[in-house]
Each structure stands twice: as structure tokens, then as C-alpha cells.
């Protein structure tokens, strides 16, 4: 069996570095033919390119000469360098067997579309692609199994769905750790600092995703993602809090059966599945242990304390562009919180204001340019609300 060629977008981030761990642990199974990164850590990108003998690298923010110099300093030689805002999409469109999109944020949409249009299997960790551009992604998708989710929750659902026909599915159940503030009241969360929000109890992730987990906006985005990926109405998608993060999600079938996927929290497992789907990679991650007493608990989400899930449901019902507005406004609000310019509770409060003010999109707006225009409006409005200063709790 020949090695599966892989392009990895977001190689210096959390998903990217773990994906390269998976590749290194399965010699001969995968061949990395392209790496893309934002450009904040050129030394790491260069080391990755040299270690995996990668012929092409793409950098969103950086000069070709600087990237080439970093690769030479790491011991590399003939590496093609792409730079600029469109570099990742250029690389994604070159037709590798698999493109793993581990980019954070809505900038991942264009590379997602490029990979799909090129016919590559898309191992998708960039949930914003589906949140912001669901209709565009569906239009670009060439076959039913072309998108393989890398989020642990959606990977779990994809695995559980193997147990029955789609017509037999009654409900999807997404699990949430509850984040660092599970059980807290809104009053208790009023003074939360970025340091507190970034102290996730079970997962090691980047600052934006970790903050989204603290507000539960991450779960709201995942709810939209599940709705798009599996074509299940949002009314039939339930979110439950599972603090142990061992059961990653479940599928309830019409006969009353519930099929769950369980494993210790380790992103290497869904990453390996994304790269090898529909096959499994032996030893990708450690299994559950059954030689010691343990317990798994589940509890409902406190929607009053964490309104992000309701916002996500409202966005889906409002229009195809409202989810893009939700996501863009949230990215701006999270950045302001991490910079110390916005209180924790006002992150979701700001998103609620922006979402409520967004007008009905004009006819014909459902294009990449239309999505980008909606995002630009949402970012500008979110920044303006942050600059205003007073509390915007919902």
C-alpha cells in the first residue's frame, strides 16, 4: 500500500503538531507533501519541513526570503515557499490525498473550499468553515465521504453512525466538559481573567479554542457543525456536560439504543482517523483502562449561565449568513477578552448584540464574497461595541 499524501494546514498549532506526531508514529503510512502556517513561528515550521522532508511550505504572514532562510538554517534545501493570505488555499488546492485543515478561525474557509474542489479528502478541524460557509462547503463537496471531521465530538458521531442507517438516527448527543467554570453562576464568572479561562480541566488547546470552551461558544459552533456535517436538525442535537471527557459524543437511534465512542482525551485519535479514514491507525492513542474503578457522569447544560448554545441555535434558524456573523463577532470579542479589553461575560454578550443587529442578508449574498462581507460587518460592529465599554450581558 502506497503512502497517503497529506497537506497539513496550521502545522505549528496544537492540531498540526499532534498530526505530525501521528505521522511520525506510523512510518510509511503517510507522506507529508505540504505544510502551511500563519508565520508566527518560522523556526518550528522550518524544523517540521526538514524533519518530514516536505517539498512545499506556505506562510500567510511572512516574506519568502525569511521563510527560505529559516529552512536553510534548519538544514533544509530545495523547498518551495508560498506566501501571502492565499498561500494556504493555493497549497490546499494542489490535489493531495488528504488535506488536514487545522487552521483556527474563519480564514480556514477558503482552504477548505480549495481542498474540496481539488477532490482531496478533507480532514476538518477548522469548525469555522462549516459554521461560516455551510452552503459553500456543501456546493464544493464532490462525494458524501469527502469530509472527515477531526473534532473529537464529530469524529465520535461519525464512528457511532456506522452502527445504523441515517434513517434510524433519532438524536445526536454532543458531550461538553463544561470548561473551567462548570457549576459557576454568572455572578461568580463576572471577574474571570484570561488566565482562569485558559486553565481547561481536560484538554490542551490554543487560547481561542480554550476561551470558547470556557464560554461554551465552542459547543455552540460544534452544534452548528454537527447540523451541517450530518444533516440533522438542530432540534435533534442535544448537548450534555460530561466532565471526564471520555465519552466524546453519542448517537441515539429510533429503537432506544445509544451508541457512544469513548477514549481518554487525546486529539491524536480523531486526527489519526481523519488522516486514515475509513481505516484506523493501530496505537494512535491509549485506550480506556478497565482495571481500576472509574465513573462517568452526565448533567444538563446550565443555559442561563452559558447562553452561547441558545445563540448558536438562533443563528441557524435566522439565515444562512447568521452563523458567519456569530463566529466573526465571537472571534473579535474573544481577542478583546484575551487582551484585557473586555470582561468575560461580555464576550457572549457582545456576540448576542451583534447577532441581534444583523439585518436580513440581501438576495444573492450566499457566496464567498457574501460570507466575507457579513463577517466584515460583524467584526466592525463587535469592535465598536468593545470600544463602547459598558456591559453588554444578554
Curated annotation (Swiss-Prot):
What's a single GO BP term from this record?
Answer: isopentenyl diphosphate biosynthetic process, methylerythritol 4-phosphate pathway involved in terpenoid biosynthetic process
Q: Name one Pfam family in it.
A: DXPR_C
**Molecular function terms, GO-annotated:** 1-deoxy-D-xylulose-5-phosphate reductoisomerase activity; manganese ion binding; NADPH binding
Q: In which pathway does it act?
A: Isoprenoid biosynthesis; isopentenyl diphosphate biosynthesis via DXP pathway; isopentenyl diphosphate from 1-deoxy-D-xylulose 5-phosphate: step 1/6
Q: Which keywords does UniProt give here?
A: Isoprene biosynthesis, Manganese, Metal-binding, NADP, Oxidoreductase
Reactions performed catalytically? 2-C-methyl-D-erythritol 4-phosphate + NADP(+) = 1-deoxy-D-xylulose 5-phosphate + NADPH + H(+)
Q: Tell me its cofactors.
A: Mg(2+); Mn(2+)
Could you say which EC number(s) this protein's record lists? 1.1.1.267
**What positions does the entry give for 1-deoxy-D-xylulose 5-phosphate binding?**
127, 152-153, 177, 200, 213, 218-219, 222
InterPro entries, alphabetized: DXP_reductoisomerase, DXP_reductoisomerase_C, DXP_reductoisomerase_N, DXPR_C, DXPR_C_sf, NAD(P)-bd_dom_sf
Kind of enzyme, top EC level?
Answer: oxidoreductase
UniProt keyword Transferase, yes or no: no
Question: Which amino acids does the record list as binding NADPH?
Answer: 12-15, 38, 126, 128, 206
NCBIfam families with a match to the protein in the record? Dxr
Q: What protein is this chain from?
A: 1-deoxy-D-xylulose 5-phosphate reductoisomerase
Question: Which organism was this protein described from?
Answer: Beutenbergia cavernae (strain ATCC BAA-8 / DSM 12333 / CCUG 43141 / JCM 11478 / NBRC 16432 / NCIMB 13614 / HKI 0122)
